[in-house]
């Protein structure tokens, strides 16, 4: 929920007043078709935003009210016939630094609703520099929160801990240096930030970003999200939005690393245990409970980075032994339960399994050796994983990766080699007499080295300092907000 359901309404209204409010809201948005020129659309859109802003926390008090307000605009003739103009206008208003906080929130919420209602609208937003607008607006919130929101975060963490203990300082004493107005501003900024982070996540999930988007992301932006992460809650929307955006950013860095020598700023702070401790704890919790395949794949990619040695960094002692066992348990469970139509996810999980068994303490403890042998040998046979459907490229990759894992991990059983010397899977899907794929054949090497492979370009070293070196340095100070843009009120 974006709005706090426990916060009291500022005013109580009769049923007639509520009906009158929503009727007036609809009348502002639904202008006659003959008045759909840009001048009328502009004035009506601004009038709608002002009316919604003035009614926020007066008539608009719940998530349901907020969504209804957004939907009235998004389904109106005003928006449907002039969608590009409306989206560009909404984004231009966000560029006004001194725009009222509540109006900023209303605008970003409307944009997020439209993005989730119609993915194509994300492309329109990008056309009008949406990534830069959202990033700069979010950056400004982060710069303020890093300076004034730290005590509020400490207070929230203490409140959580005090609920589980009999002693401790009260929340009020931790918040004593912040006035009620300060706390209100911090909460409003977190609300706006939550929506903006979700918008950026949607862009990275569904749209093709360009390298210029990543180049404007600086160290402070990534550092703030990583350092302010909490692992004591799974339900905090701000925290969850930070987590998802870091996953999406990391995925973008990995994709662009195939073509560009670009520093992965997520990885840079990820291997610094003093900064990423809470993020890593939350990662393990969410990886164990995740049910959304795209999010699972994003988590796999970041776990893969952690488990891969680079430069001075070694993953051998990054995770505790119990955490490693949890990872193995989750991987075995997921690999067994994945349906045939989610074979890409199984491919990704297998790519994580290899460095997990090879580069961590599991290489010495041999945890669940028999279960791993049984599972990997089963997945090494093509007929086992696509019984009722034709063999696809993803099925062949599953077989190849399973055999690769058995061959590369010394303490696992090496799979038997077919008597014909290692023939590959026949291109004819109706004839699969050779059910085990041999990794030694050129065809199967191409499967793993194909252009666009998830972890191709492994030789490209990510520019990041070792954990030991970075621990000795103080974290970078938060920079000031971006240079002020043209200020004023919407016209």
From Swiss-Prot:
Disulfide bonds: none annotated. InterPro entries: SPIN90/Ldb17, SPIN90/Ldb17_LRD. GO terms for molecular function: Arp2/3 complex binding. Keywords: Cytoplasm, Phosphoprotein. Its main location: cytoplasm. GO terms for biological process: actin cortical patch assembly; actin cortical patch localization; endocytosis. It is found in: Cytoplasm; Bud; Bud neck. Residues 413-491 are annotated as: Disordered. Residues 414-435 have a biased composition (Low complexity). The keyword Cytoplasm applies. One of its GO terms (cellular component) is actin cortical patch. The keyword Transport does not apply. Signal peptide: none annotated. It holds the Pfam family SPIN90_LRD. May be involved in protein-linked oligosaccharide phosphorylation since the deletion reduces the negative charge of the cell surface. Belongs to the LDB17 family. This is Protein LDB17. It comes from Saccharomyces cerevisiae (strain ATCC 204508 / S288c) (Baker's yeast).
């Amino acid at each position: 929920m974006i709005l706090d359901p426990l916060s009291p309404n500022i005013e109580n209204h009769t049923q007639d007043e509520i009906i009158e409010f929503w009727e007036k809201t609809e009348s502002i948005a639904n202008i006659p078709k003959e008045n759909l020129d840009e001048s009328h659309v502009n004035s009506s859109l601004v009038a709608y935003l002002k009316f919604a802003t003035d009614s926020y926390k007066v008539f608009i008090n719940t998530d349901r009210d907020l969504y209804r307000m957004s939907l009235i605009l998004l389904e109106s003739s005003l928006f449907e016939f002039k969608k590009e103009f409306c989206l560009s206008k909404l984004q231009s208003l966000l560029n006004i630094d001194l725009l009222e906080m509540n109006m900023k929130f209303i605008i970003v919420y409307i944009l997020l609703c439209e993005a989730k209602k119609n993915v194509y609208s994300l492309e329109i937003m990008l056309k009008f520099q949406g990534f830069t607008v959202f990033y700069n607006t979010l950056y400004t919130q982060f710069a303020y929160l890093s300076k004034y929101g730290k005590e509020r975060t400490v207070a929230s963490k203490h409140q959580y801990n005090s609920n589980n203990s009999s002693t401790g300082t009260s929340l009020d004493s931790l918040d004593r240096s912040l006035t009620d107005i300060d706390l209100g501003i911090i909460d409003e900024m977190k609300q706006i930030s939550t929506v903006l982070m979700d918008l950026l996540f949607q862009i990275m999930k569904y749209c093709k970003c360009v390298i210029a988007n990543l180049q404007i992301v600086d160290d402070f932006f990534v550092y703030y999200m990583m350092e302010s992460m909490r692992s004591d809650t799974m339900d905090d929307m701000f925290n969850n939005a930070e987590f998802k955006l870091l996953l999406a950013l990391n995925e973008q860095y990995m994709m662009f690393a195939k073509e560009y020598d670009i520093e992965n700023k997520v990885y840079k702070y990820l291997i610094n245990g003093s900064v990423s401790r809470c993020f890593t704890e939350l990662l393990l919790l969410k990886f164990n409970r995740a049910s959304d395949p795209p999010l699972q794949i994003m988590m796999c990619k970041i776990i893969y980075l952690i488990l891969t040695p680079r430069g001075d960094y070694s993953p051998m002692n990054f995770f505790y032994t119990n955490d490693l066992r949890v990872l193995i348990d989750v991987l075995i469970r997921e690999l067994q339960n994945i349906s045939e139509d989610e074979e890409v996810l199984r491919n990704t999980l297998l790519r994580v399994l290899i460095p997990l068994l090879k580069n961590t303490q599991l290489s010495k403890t041999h945890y669940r050796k028999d279960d791993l042998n049984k599972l990997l040998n089963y997945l090494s046979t093509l007929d086992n994983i696509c019984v009722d459907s034709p063999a696809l490229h993803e099925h062949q990759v599953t077989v190849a990766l399973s055999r690769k894992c058995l061959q590369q991990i010394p303490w696992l059983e090496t799979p038997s080699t077919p008597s014909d010397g290692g023939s590959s899977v026949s291109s004819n899907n109706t004839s699969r007499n050779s059910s085990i794929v041999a990794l030694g054949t050129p065809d199967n090497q191409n499967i793993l080295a194909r252009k666009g492979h998830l972890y191709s370009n492994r030789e490209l070293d990510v520019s990041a300092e070792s954990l030991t070196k970075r621990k000795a340095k103080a974290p970078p100070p938060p920079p000031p907000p971006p240079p002020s843009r043209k200020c004023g009120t919407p016209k």
